[in-house]
Amino acid sequence: MSSQSIASPSECIYKHLKKEPLLDDNLIVALMANIAIETGYTFDYKTVQRGERSDPAYGLFQLDPRGGLYDLYIDYLDYSKSDDSAESQLNMMVDILLRQWDKGVAHVGHGNVNKVLAAAEKSAEEATRAFCDHILRPGKPHMERRLAAIVGVNKSISTINDIA
């Protein structure tokens, strides 16, 4: 009898991001650290913002109907002919960061994409800050939590790579 393990959501996210050869490892860590905080470490793409709002933020990146990223995501689903999923949410961000979806790049700003990519060349910490500040732009960034999440993300990645 063989035992098969079911991949955790964070493992699935990591493996999906690693499929894109143009994504810098620092940027992958930054995306995952931000996702950890945005989802409360569940890495569940259906995560809904807690609170009393009638239009809560949603998903891996807490796409906010009031901030424009949610509407952009709806446009991306139409553009990519995809259904809502973790992969679709990740693909949208990757397509923006790799400048493969012009509408998304224009929405977040070419300069902001450049800042994130330049930060990723330096370190995962710089990339985490830049992605939060220039792409997500949360009301309360909790930057110390995002930076602390890098340690856990790196441990998870190390474990995933050891198993593979």
Which residue stretches match the model-derived regions?
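Peptidoglycan-targeting cell-wall enzymes and recognition modules
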Residues: 2-17, 36-123
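Secondary-structure transition/hinge residues
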Residues: 21, 101-105, 139, 158
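Loop/turn elements at helix/coil->beta-strand transitions in domains of secreted/extracellular proteins
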Residues: 23-29, 88, 126
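Short, functionally critical alpha-helical segments immediately adjacent to catalytic or ligand/cofactor-binding
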Residues: 26-42, 93, 130-132
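Extracellular structured ligand-interaction cores
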Residues: 29, 58-60, 128
